[in-house]
Amino acid sequence: RIHPCPVNKCKCSRAPGRSLSYSKRIINEIRQNPSKCQIFFYQTSPPPSLAPYPLQRLRPYPSSMNPRDLEMVVVTNFQSQSKRRVLFNKFQISQLEKRLKQRYLTAQERQELAHTIGLTPTQVKIWFQNHAYKMKRLFHDDHVEASVHKWPIKSAHLQPKVSTRVV
């Protein structure tokens, strides 16, 4: 896997995770002043004696690489960076929580909800997945705490429903 790395605190050090337009500006800087930056690549399988963490061991990129290949390396790397975390506003969260009461959202319902609250359907899907995992973890943590301390579970929504029918 190829990775840009700073040399003497070059601006390349701030490139990963930035937008593609930012990476294009970096490419222009590299073209104009190639001595300011040096491209490195990961050696993915060095001998164990050379590095305790193989992916952290860097080697200079071969000097035989032409500038067009260099551009492809840089652009490809920037495009593969993960997107920034999306912070939902209160309105979006309230709308998502309202729909949470339904067990399952169809793709169409998810798309409509996403459009209504200004998110992508994928963001809505991931929010529901994350919320389900959070509830599962809270349920598990409450049960572990209750069994360790022999205290009753305080969360009413996690308690099993008991029938209170009077005959």
UniProtKB/Swiss-Prot annotation:
Compartment(s): Nucleus
SMART domains: HOX (SM00389)
Residue ranges: DNA binding: 80-139
SUPFAM superfamilies: Homeodomain-like (SSF46689)
Organism: Echinococcus granulosus
Keywords: Developmental protein, DNA-binding, Homeobox, Nucleus
Gene Ontology annotations for the cellular component aspect, listed alphabetically: nucleus
Protein name: Homeobox protein EgHBX3
Lineage of the organism: Eukaryota, Metazoa, Spiralia, Lophotrochozoa, Platyhelminthes
Primary localisation category: nucleus
